[in-house]
Regions:
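C-terminal cap/substrate-recognition subdomain and adjoining C-terminal extension
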Residues: 26-31, 62, 186-307
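Bacterial N-terminal signal peptides that target proteins for export
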Residues: 2-12
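Short, acidic loop-to-helix structural element flanking the phosphoryl-transfer center
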Residues: 148-176, 183-184
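Non-catalytic pre-domain segments flanking phosphatase-related domains
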Residues: 23-116, 288-307
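Bacterial N-terminal signal peptides
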Residues: 10-22
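Sec-exported extracytoplasmic/periplasmic mature domains
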Residues: 69, 73, 128, 166-174, ...
Length: 307
């Protein structure tokens, strides 16, 4: 998770009025996004309240389980010998890799694991987002700190996650979490995950948090620690940075979008890299009017043009 701001009810209108003011053939209009019900931001309605996202999440976790099951049928080598079959390839990029030239950490002598983000990937922060929506206040680091240290009763598992992780553990695959929650609050995060049915977890073994490695919110240093111990056959998140920090390396929204479709990495989606929906916060919520709408894909409603 990378938390920046909560989507408010006007995010889809950002920059539109300014762009329209320069079009002399278009009458001035006021654009407003649907306000939601009783002021609930539409992104929160979608993520925390809709059946659509619940179905998407279950679909993603079902696909993850099927994928991991197929991988786990291979022989996991702990030494040489004639019974060793083809090594399953790690999906963690090596330290010298790029998106244009990806190279992956090797799996020799390592047992299988999957790595998941926590917030809005495995655990829904419904209670925290309720407080944000009800107060109308912007994101506040101190409030998030208080939430991390809460008892976790107002959070719950992402639909499909509990059954998937239970099935994956039964296959002999270790489940590891890599989160930007802080290491000083590790025991609270352990408790929240366990309460939601996503455990067992143990900080430093199957739970890695901000502060466990250099780099602050960057997850690659923690991924490197995990990949040194395990053959990471799948990763799950709600942000591109849950797969590699290279997606956050100064790329524009258009460049990030293009990077996901590049031949070198496109085949990983649903095949080692699994991404869930998050329209509420994160690196996806970026881009002005020009960045979001390509010039060759714009329509001017003739009903708004002047006679």
């Amino acid at each position: 998770m990378i938390r920046r701001s909560v989507v408010d009810s006007c995010i889809w209108a950002f920059g539109i009025a300014a762009a329209l003011s320069g079009c002399v053939s278009i009458a001035p209009v006021t654009v407003a996004a649907p306000p939601g019900v009783r002021g609930v931001p539409t992104g929160m309605q979608y993520l925390y309240g809709s059946g659509e996202v619940a179905a998407i999440s279950r679909q993603a976790y079902a696909a993850l389980t099927t994928y991991v099951s197929g991988r786990s049928r291979m022989h996991w080598p702990v030494g040489g010998g004639p019974t060793v079959r083809m090594l399953p390839q790690s999906v963690v990029l090596a330290s010298d890799a790029t998106l244009a030239a990806p190279r992956f950490v090797d799996c020799v002598g390592k047992r299988p694991a999957i790595v998941l983000d926590v917030d809005e990937t495995a655990l829904l922060n419904t209670g925290y987002e309720y407080a944000d929506a009800a107060s109308g206040l912007p994101y506040d680091a101190a409030r998030w700190e208080r939430w991390e240290r809460s008892d976790g009763r107002a959070s719950g598992a992402v639909p499909g996650a509990v059954d998937a992780l239970k099935a994956i553990r039964a296959l002999g695959v270790t489940v590891i979490f890599n989160s930007n929650r802080t290491a000083v609050n590790a025991r609270y995060t352990e408790a929240a995950l366990t309460r939601a049915g996503l455990g067992p977890v143990r900080h430093g073994e199957t739970l890695f948090l901000k502060g466990d490695a250099p780099g602050g919110s960057a997850k690659d240093p923690r991924r490197a620690i995990i990949a040194a111990r395990y053959c990471v056959i799948a990763m799950v998140g709600d942000q591109l940075g849950d797969m590699t920090d290279l997606f956050n390396a100064g790329l524009t929204p258009a460049q990030r979008r293009s990077a996901t479709a590049a031949p070198e990495v496109a085949g990983l989606w649903g095949n080692g890299w699994f991404l869930l929906t998050n329209p509420v916060y994160g690196t996806a919520l970026a881009g002005d009017y020009d960045a979001v709408f390509p010039t060759d894909q714009r329509w001017v409603d003739p009903g708004t043009t002047k006679e």
